[in-house]
């Protein structure tokens, strides 16, 4: 950003007083890296630490950030403030050093709230659909020429980044309820997509506590702000009378203010009509599959309509929407080597969904768009606690595919829990008599174990939130072909 552009931005967003050097602990995470990227473009000196390089850290280094691939006390030297992710423990040496040096230590959401303070903030919350809805709102506002700043939890594929600094007055951000830190945000508009029991350790295992936290989040809106909420969700419908703010509802329900009807899916695209109060019906072509994405689009349209964005810009943005990273991410269609006389092709799709509701939505989108395909899922459960708490739901949802291969649980730092492991889950699913799941004990054997189950007319869903995304990309690189020892050594 040049001096003239920075001066224009400062007329909208004042500098944080006496803050020059901002250090991020856990900077490689998508949410942390996105905020760091916006601040780097605003002219702040950025440094950060993480355990290993990734595309987020590379992008920040390209912007001039200093990245350390270790956690050492000296990394925070000269920092004005230290920003930490919820995944970082209090005994991290950089946090300890910052406290000893009397450097302020704040959570990611506090810095996001500071970015939002002098802008027109639009925050997208909910158990599922936040990342995609954030990208849709951002795409519509960009298409309308409003040049928004956005901070997303996933890659916005059209922009090639998780976050971007715009010159307009809007900041569009994903709001994370996993650690309740979204309570720091004070937006002008808030979307809540749905509310389910997840991250319950944050809420002392009390679902009422989680629901009240969402109410508190919405009450951070000014009295002239607006809450946009999915009335199809039973919990949101229950909470609506307790929301003391202006509300707009959306959904397939007949009483929704923005109503989805006549939904059809053809391949990767959804086609539907949106009915809005005092507006002409809007016939939408959405370049994203699944009824869940039609709901995400309805939320984005509700916000854009309230802002006065013209329908033509909305429709262009949705029809050209390129999606977000690891959300029904099409990695290619590959010819198959003949196996037992079979040949043909297999489509490969990578998806981040790791909650039963998300996995169910992905399966339904795949079935609706490609009904004749043999649906093969490679699934990696995420966290032992989630596997334990939602065990029966996972067992029910995963029986909907034709063939299931399952990796070991990705622990995300958790200790194993007896009975909440992949072997137990495979045994339970097998006992239900619909499919015979295959346990993959070693990720290096995925291609080898996948090949025999393919028919030549397949859609492979690589599903989960752990390191399974890397496995999906490696499958694409080798075009699904099992590697010989010589090929692996050559690679």
From Swiss-Prot:
This protein's GO CC annotations: cytoplasm
Magnesium among keywords: no
Residues annotated as binding ATP: 126-132
Enzyme class: ligase
pH effect summary: Optimum pH is 8.6.
Catalyzed reaction equations: UDP-N-acetyl-alpha-D-muramate + L-alanine + ATP = UDP-N-acetyl-alpha-D-muramoyl-L-alanine + ADP + phosphate + H(+)
Stretches of the chain forming a coiled coil according to its record: none
InterPro entries xref list: Mur-like_cat_sf, Mur_ligase_C, Mur_ligase_C_dom_sf, Mur_ligase_cen, Mur_ligase_N, MurCDEF_pg_biosynth, UDP-N-AcMur_Ala_ligase_MurC
MF term (GO), any: protein homodimerization activity
Protein localization: Cytoplasm
Activity under varying temperature: Optimum temperature is 45 degrees Celsius.
PANTHER family in alphabetical order: UDP-N-ACETYLMURAMATE--L-ALANINE LIGASE (PTHR43445:SF3), UDP-N-ACETYLMURAMATE--L-ALANINE LIGASE-RELATED (PTHR43445)
Stored HAMAP family: MurC
Function: Cell wall formation.
Record-given protein name: UDP-N-acetylmuramate--L-alanine ligase
Classification lineage: Bacteria, Pseudomonadati, Pseudomonadota, Gammaproteobacteria, Enterobacterales
Gene this chain is encoded by: murC
């Amino acid at each position: 950003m040049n001096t003239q552009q920075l001066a224009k931005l400062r007329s909208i967003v004042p500098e944080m007083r006496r803050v020059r050097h901002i250090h991020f602990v856990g900077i490689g995470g998508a949410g942390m890296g996105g905020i760091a990227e916006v601040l780097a473009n605003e002219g702040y000196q950025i440094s950060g630490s993480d355990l290993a390089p990734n595309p987020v850290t590379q992008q920040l280094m390209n912007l001039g950030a200093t990245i350390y691939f270790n956690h050492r006390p000296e990394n925070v030297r000269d920092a004005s403030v230290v920003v930490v992710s919820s995944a970082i423990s209090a005994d991290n040496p950089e946090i300890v050093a910052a406290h000893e040096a009397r450097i302020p230590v704040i959570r990611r959401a506090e810095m996001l709230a500071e970015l939002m303070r002098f802008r027109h903030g639009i925050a997208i919350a909910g158990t599922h659909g936040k990342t995609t809805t954030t990208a849709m709102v951002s795409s519509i506002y960009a298409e309308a020429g409003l040049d928004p700043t956005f901070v997303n939890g996933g890659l916005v594929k059209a922009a090639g980044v998780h976050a971007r600094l715009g010159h307009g007055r809007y900041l569009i951000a994903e709001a994370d309820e996993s650690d309740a830190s979204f309570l720091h945000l004070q937006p002008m508009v808030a979307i809540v997509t749905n509310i389910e029991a997840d991250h319950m350790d944050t809420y002392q295992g009390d679902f009422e506590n989680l629901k009240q936290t969402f109410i508190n989040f919405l009450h951070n809106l000014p009295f002239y702000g607006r809450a946009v909420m999915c009335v199809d969700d039973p919990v949101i419908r229950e909470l609506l009378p307790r929301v003391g703010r202006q509300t707009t509802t959306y959904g397939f329900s007949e009483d929704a203010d923005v109503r989805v009807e006549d939904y059809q899916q053809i391949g990767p695209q959804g086609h539907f009509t949106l009915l809005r109060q005092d507006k002409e019906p809007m016939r939408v072509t959405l370049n994203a599959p699944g009824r869940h994405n039609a709901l995400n689009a309805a939320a984005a349209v509700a916000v854009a309509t309230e802002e006065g964005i013209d329908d033509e810009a909305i429709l262009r943005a949705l029809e050209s929407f390129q999606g977000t990273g690891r959300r029904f991410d099409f990695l290619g269609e590959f010819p198959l080597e003949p196996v037992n006389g079979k040949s043909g092709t297999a489509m490969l799709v990578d998806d981040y969904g790791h909650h039963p509701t998300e996995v169910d939505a992905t399966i339904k989108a795949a079935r609706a768009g490609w009904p004749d395909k043999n649906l093969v899922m490679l699934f990696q459960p995420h966290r032992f606690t989630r596997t334990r708490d939602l065990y029966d739901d996972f067992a029910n949802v995963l029986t909907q595919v034709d063939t299931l291969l399952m990796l070991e649980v990705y622990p995300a730092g958790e200790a194993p829990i007896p009975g909440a492991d992949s072997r137990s889950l495979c045994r339970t699913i097998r006992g239900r008599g619909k499919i015979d799941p295959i346990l993959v004990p070693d990720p290096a054997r995925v291609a080898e174990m996948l090949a025999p189950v393919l028919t030549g007319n397949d859609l492979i869903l690589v599903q989960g939130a752990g390191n399974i995304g890397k496995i999906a990309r490696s499958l694409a690189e080798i075009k699904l072909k099992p590697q010989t020892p010589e090929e692996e050594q050559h690679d």
